[in-house]
Amino acid sequence: MKIGVLTFHAAMNVGAQLQALALFKTLKDAGHEVEFIRYEPNYLKYPYRFFRNARIKNGIVSYVKQCLLHIFCDTYTWIKTKRHYGDFQERFYTLSRRVYKNPDELAKAVYDAIITGSDQVWNPEITNGNLDPMYTLHFQSDRIRKISYAASFSEKHIDRNMAEELVGRIKSFYAVSVREECLKKYFDNLSQLHIEVVLDPTLLLTKSQWLALMPEKRMIKERYVLLYQARGIKKDVLKQATDLADKLHATVYDASGMNYRVAKYGKQYVSPIEFLNLVFFAEAVVTVSFHGTALSLVLEKPFFSICLNDGRDGRVINLLKGMGLSSQLKPVGEELAVPRMDYSLARRHLDTARTASLSFLFKALN
């Protein structure tokens, strides 16, 4: 089949890029002709804001200094990151020749199927306050099979009217899946639609498949603990990683990005492939990130996933609970012991979940 995929494939975010790659590779390895549909809404083009961390409470002079620091540091980092991600996309992706601007254009596209997801493609907080009709495949077509794979949204950011509107749109889908159990329950309370819960695409690929994509040579020669925070920089988490590194006679390497204040611990920007390398060769991983957790899991690395208790820990908690690894969840500030992990049980759980998720995907395309 010729398949178009609508996701946040151009987002300059390690998780977004690697999950897009994983879904692309899974479909392509199954013999399908696959490309990412180029859709470039303004709300995704430039996610970084120069003044987002500046504070005026310390006086106008301090505020101006902070703004200037953000302008120069964020701009430099954004340019470097854009280049890294552009190289990654050119190497691994196939993109549609044309840029699509509305659902009517999609209805005329020469695809046998269009898959929307993974990622929070149905989250109005991300899609400019509304359900984006592109990501909900809001068009009429008897020719194109509509499928969602691991699509997501936040219950906190969608009201009942909008949820009912979403249900109305996905009624025309051939197959629907979401990536969180809570979202399936949410839909079950609103409709009679058959909805399945599937793995995030990063977990569809095996350890050997991920390793085949990255260079064998390690980036960092010395022993290190990898720190990756995707929900803002928390000094307490940095301290947890630093203390753990001391126990392991290692240094801390921070791959969080966009954070010049702790640049001495690492780089401000890494490519998605570099990130894989950093995870695989780390003595341990300390992360506040679903994808940091997922990749540590699939690469079978010692790790700790730090919970911020901000209402956004659910995905990680559910994932690790399902894998029998809840012991790797730790609150902010708690001392981290040297991790000693046995992956034998988690490996079996992951294999079972992967088989079910691939079954959903391939059945939807057959």
Give residue ranges: language-model regions.
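Active-site anion-handling motifs in enzyme catalytic cores
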Residues: 1-366
